[in-house]
Amino acid sequence: MTELGMELESVRLATFGEWPLNAPVSAEDLVANGFFATGNWLEAECHFCHVRIDRWEYGDQVAERHRRSSPICSMVLAPNHCGNVPRSQESDNEGNSVVDSPESCSCPDLLLEANRLVTFKDWPNPNITPQALAKAGFYYLNRLDHVKCVWCNGVIAKWEKNDNAFEEHKRFFPQCPRVQMGPLIEFATGKNLDELGIQPTTLPLRPKYACVDARLRTFTDWPISNIQPASALAQAGLYYQKIGDQVRCFHCNIGLRSWQKEDEPWFEHAKWSPKCQFVLLAKGPAYVSEVLATTAANASSQPATAPAPTLQADVLMDEAPAKEALALGIDGGVVRNAIQRKLLSSGCAFSTLDELLHDIFDDAGAGAALEVREPPEPSAPFIEPCQATTSKAASVPIPVADSIPAKPQAAEAVANISKITDEIQKMSVATPNGNLSLEEENRQLKDARLCKVCLDEEVGVVFLPCGHLATCNQCAPSVANCPMCRADIKGFVRTFLS
C-alpha cells in the first residue's frame, strides 16, 4: 500500500478512522513514526520501509519497535530527511502546497549522494573534494567550509590538506549510522536494498515454531496427510493449529486452509503473503514475483486456499471469560493480549475462564496458582541524535543514541560475501593435509558447509553487518544474533555455493 500522499502525516492519520481508542499505541504516535493503518485489525505499515507490525502491547514505544523491526528504515535513520511531512508543516489552506520549515532541508532526498553533491556548487576549500565529503554523508551549509551530516547532524569545518572525509567523520562522530554503514556503501531505500539482494530482518511472530522440527511436531494428528504431506507444509514455514486443515505461518502469521491435492505449499504461501520475510528469504524475490504473475494470469480461477477468519478482541473483552478474569484483578492489557494471541493462532475465542487463565500463565511462564501480573515495562525510547558543531581544531563528539551499538561495517560485510564463498570452495578442492586422514578432511569440509543451527542443511545466508555465512535459509529467520560472533543481525543476503 503505497498511495500517493502517504508522505503526509495528515493523509496517514486519515487511515486510522477505525483504530480503537483503547489500543495499546495511539494513532498519533504511529503516524509520527511513519505508519499508516492497513485496515487489518491492529496492523500498521511504515510508508518508508513497508515493515508491518501488528502485535502491539501496552507499554510499547512505537519508535523503539520500529527501530528493532527495521533498523535501516530512512524514517528511523534520518526522520528529517526521508520525505516525511509533519502536520505542522502542512498549509492551513486545503489544496495549497507544503512549505518546508527553516529547520528542514529543502531537498528531502539528501540521503542520496548525488543530491548532496549538488549542494557543493560554491565549495571554497581546495583541501578536500566535494565528492569525498558527499560520499561520507555530508552536504554543504553554504557557510565557510562547514558541512553537515544528514544522519547524525554533526557539523565539521576547517578542513586541512590530506584529510580523509570518512575518517574525520568517524573520529568525531563514531556512533553515526552513516559511519557504521562503512565508506563503500551508499544509503539505500527499501527498493535499492531489494536490488542489492539485501533483506532487512523482521522478527517472526511465532518464534517457537521457527524450527522445522517444531512445526513438524504440530502435525501429529494431521487429518489430510494423503492430500498434503506434513513435511512439505512444515518446510514452507507452516504449523498445524489442530482445527480442520488450518495451518499458519510462524513468521508472517498468515492462516491457510481448504487444501487440495494439487496445491503446492510454497506457492500458496507466497500467493497469500507475498511480503512474508521467510518466503522471500527461503525462495527469493524472483519466485514470489513469478507466483504473483501466475496468480494474476489466473485471476478468474477459484482460490485454493483462503486466509483464516479472525474476530475482534474488543468484542470479546465484553464476554464472560474476559470479565471474570478482570474481576480476579488481572490487568486488562494482559487479558487483551491473551485474547489477541488466541485469535491470531486459532481464529477463535476462549470458551471458558480456565482456558483463558491457562494461556496467560503459559505465556508468563507462571505456575498453576493464580497470579496477578504487572503490566509490561515500557520499552526504552530511541533517543534522537543531538546536533553538534565540530571544528577540527577543537572537536566535541556528538551524543548519538546509546541504543545503536558499534558494529562491523555493512560495506565490508557485503564485499566479503564473495570472499567467504570462494574460501569455502577452495576448501572443497584443497589438497588433503598430510597430518589429517582423508576421512577427517572430508568431515571438516562438510562441517564448514553445514548450518550451525540445525546441523543438517547447507549454509545459504550471509548475516549483515558481521558477514558470517552460518545458517541455512530455514534457520536464518529464527536467530536474532549471529551464532558465530553474537552480533545483532540487521539484514540477510541469500548466498549460493556452486
Swiss-Prot record:
Tissue: Expressed in both principal and stellar cells of the Malphigian tubules.
Effect of residue 149 to G: No effect on binding to Drice or Dredd
Induction note: Constitutively expressed. Up-regulated by bacterial lipopolysaccharides (LPS) in Malpighian tubules but not in salivary glands.
Zinc finger (RING-type): 451-486
Effect of gene knockout: Normal development and viability. Acute sensitivity to infection by Gram-negative bacteria with failure to induce expression of antibacterial peptide genes and inability to mount a proper innate immune response. Loss of cleavage and nuclear translocation of Rel. Increased activity of the effector caspase Drice and increased apoptosis following x-ray irradiation. Reduced ion channel expression in Malpighian tubules.
UniProt PTM: Caspase-dependent cleavage is required for suppression of Drice-mediated cell death.
Annotated signal peptide: none
Residue spans of the BIR repeats: 12-77, 116-180, 215-280
Assigned keywords, A-Z: Apoptosis, Cytoplasm, Immunity, Innate immunity, Metal-binding, Nucleus, Repeat, Zinc, Zinc-finger
Disulfide bridge map: none
GO cellular component, one term: cytosol
Quaternary assembly: Interacts with the caspase Strica. Interacts (via BIR2 domain) with rpr and grim. Interacts (via the BIR2 and BIR3 domains) with hid. Interacts (via BIR3 domain) with Drice. Interacts with Dredd; likely to bind Dredd simultaneously with Fadd to form a trimeric complex.
PANTHER family tied to this protein: DEATH-ASSOCIATED INHIBITOR OF APOPTOSIS 2, INHIBITOR OF APOPTOSIS
UniProt family annotation: Belongs to the IAP family.
Protein name as it appears in the record: Death-associated inhibitor of apoptosis 2
Organism: Drosophila melanogaster (Fruit fly)
